């Protein structure tokens, strides 16, 4: 009964398109009616859509926050959802750049949770994998045979705290592996 409302920061993100497909299938398999909304990378659109969902019968709210790392925005959305006594899940995009601040937000409402990765650890793992791969395949990767590997680093959305950390720690750890060799 009711709808699970899922607010996406954008439908244009390729990775999130695959997440959306899998999430919708999993929720529908549990008999949940899912309403997906595209915020088009606009926080005001997302906020307005969530407020509309709250007054039109949503029974749960799932949020892929447009403004990654914006604790004030996350607090406002949390307050709106908690005022309706509904469960809320924030996912994929950090609600704050400060872990203690984010933890306090979720401890303040017992029907809330954040689902995401340990992005520092993800970056470390990615960096180690890249470093080890380069060591094992150096001759293949040194295309101009100058003893250096040229690369281009693609990073996700500039505001996404997870993408920022994965890039930072990925490069640092790859460098550590290669420097140690």
Predicted regions and their residues:
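A residue-level marker of the well-folded mature domains of exported/periplasmic proteins
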Residues: 1-181
């Amino acid at each position: 009964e009711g709808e699970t409302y899922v607010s996406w920061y954008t439908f244009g993100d390729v990775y999130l398109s695959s997440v959306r497909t899998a999430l919708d299938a999993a929720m529908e398999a549990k008999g949940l009616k899912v309403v997906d909304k595209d915020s088009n990378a606009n926080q005001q659109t997302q906020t307005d859509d969530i407020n509309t969902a709250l007054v039109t019968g949503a029974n749960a709210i799932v949020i892929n926050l447009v403004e990654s790392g914006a604790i004030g925005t996350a607090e406002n959305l949390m307050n709106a959802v908690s005022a309706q006594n509904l469960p809320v899940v924030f996912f994929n995009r950090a609600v704050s750049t400060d872990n203690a601040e984010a933890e306090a937000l979720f401890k303040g409402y017992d029907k809330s949770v954040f689902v995401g990765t340990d992005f520092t650890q993800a970056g470390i793992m990615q960096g180690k994998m890249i470093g080890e791969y380069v060591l094992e395949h150096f001759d293949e990767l040194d295309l101009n045979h100058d003893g250096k590997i040229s690369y281009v680093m693609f990073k996700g959305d500039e505001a996404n705290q997870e993408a920022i950390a994965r890039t930072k720690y990925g490069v640092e750890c790859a460098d550590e592996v290669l420097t140690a060799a």
